[in-house]
Each structure stands twice: as C-alpha cells, then as structure tokens.
C-alpha cells in the first residue's frame, strides 16, 4: 500500500536552485521560436481550409498542435516564474515548478507533432520516376518518422514521467501532479485526433473517425 507523507511543519523545505528553472526557461524560449517559424511556414503545404479573413489556407493538423504548444509553453512560463520565492535568492520551492516542467514537455511534444505529422503525410503522396527511387525515398521517410516518434515519445511520456519520479515534493503533491498530467494527455489526444479527422479524413472522403486513444501514440497516425 502506498504510504502518503504527512505534512510536518518541521520537515525540510524543498529548495531548488534557480538555475534549474532558468535552464527550462531557455528550452521554452527555443520552443517558442520554433513554433513561430512553423506557423509562418505552414503556407507552403498544399490543401487546407480557405477561411474568410485569412490570406493563406489553414492546415488544422499544423495549426492545432502548434496552438496547443504555444498555450502550454505560456502556461509553463507562468508556472516557472510563480514557483520561485520573492526574496534575494529566488530559490524555487513551490510545486508549480514540476507542473511547469510537465507543461514544457507536453508543449515540446506538440511542436514535434505540428512539424513531423503534416510533412510526413505530404511525403506519402510523392511519386518518383522509378521503383528504386521510390524504395529509397520510402526508407528515408521511415527513418524521419522514427526520429520524430522518438522525439515525441521522449517529450510526451519520458520527460514527464522522470519529472514525477524525481519530484522532491510529498507523495500527495506528486499524485496530484500525476493526475494533472494524465488529464492533459487525454485532452491533447482528443484534440489532436479531432484535428487529424478534419484535415485528413474529411478531405479524403472518409467518414470513419480516428479513435481519440490513438492520439496517445500520435506517431502511429503520421
């Protein structure tokens, strides 16, 4: 049976060096830059929805994951900043730190989805002149898909799980963080599979929706 730690006023307070948070803020800055570039360059893809008020077509399989990535990155920024004490040292002592780290990892996973997924689906439609060229290209496509899948699995599962395992906070707090993480995973899976249905299946004339559970292993849809 899992034994929960009791809150003890004399217990040692969690104190995490502020440099740990700064390193994660650097990752978020890099991720936000990548998101901006991908949103700008999404117009190079063919197809998409033509909506009034937009000069370029909207690709749901690109836009939805990137908007999720942007929102999660901003949430992570807020949580990281809120986790540090407002004193001369700025030591991180609040459970907002690991929660922000989980949001950061999920944001990275959505950035991977917004890049690899749509481009790999476009590559599937490419037809080369000879069978040998097509076979070589197919091997290249599978290699890129494998790299994207590894990156996605690392960000969506490995990173958050390591954060929960290494959490310096009480078992009760860590359990709350775990429940929040699972809830976010389900919400993201449902949203991304819905976007996949809209942008791929409806355009292809297919009416059978993709089960939202496949969004928990998004590389299977690429």
Where are these regions (language model features)?
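N-terminal juxtamembrane cytosolic/stromal segments of multi-pass membrane proteins
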Residues: 1-22, 27
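Alpha-helical transmembrane segments of integral membrane proteins
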Residues: 52-222
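Short, contiguous, well-ordered secondary-structure segments
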Residues: 1-2, 6-7, 50-52, 56-57
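Generic detector of bulky aromatic hydrophobic side chains
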Residues: 12, 16, 34, 127-132
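The first (N-terminal) embedded transmembrane alpha-helix
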Residues: 20-41
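Membrane-interface helix-loop junction between the first two transmembrane segments
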Residues: 39-51
């Amino acid at each position: 049976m899992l034994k929960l730690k009791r809150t003890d006023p004399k217990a040692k307070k969690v104190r995490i060096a502020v440099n740990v948070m700064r390193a994660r803020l650097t990752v978020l800055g890099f991720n936000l830059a990548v998101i901006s570039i991908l949103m700008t360059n999404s117009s190079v893809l063919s197809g998409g929805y033509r909506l009034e008020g937009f000069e370029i077509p909207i690709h749901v399989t690109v836009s939805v994951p990137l908007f999720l990535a942007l929102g999660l990155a901003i949430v992570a920024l807020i949580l990281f900043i809120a986790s540090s004490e407002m004193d001369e040292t700025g030591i991180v002592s609040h459970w907002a730190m690991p929660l922000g780290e989980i949001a950061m990892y999920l944001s990275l996973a959505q950035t991977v989805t917004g890049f690899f997924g749509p481009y790999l689906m476009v590559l599937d439609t490419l037809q080369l002149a000879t069978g040998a060229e097509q076979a070589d290209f197919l091997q290249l496509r599978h290699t890129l898909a494998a790299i994207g899948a590894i990156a996605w699995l690392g960000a969506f599962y490995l990173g958050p799980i390591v954060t929960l395992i290494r959490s310096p906070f009480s078992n009760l707090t860590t359990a709350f963080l775990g429940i929040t993480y699972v809830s976010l995973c389900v919400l993201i899976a449902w949203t991304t599979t819905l976007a996949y249905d809209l942008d791929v299946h409806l355009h292809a004339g297919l009416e059978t929706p993709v089960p939202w559970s496949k969004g928990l292993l998004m590389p299977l849809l690429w």
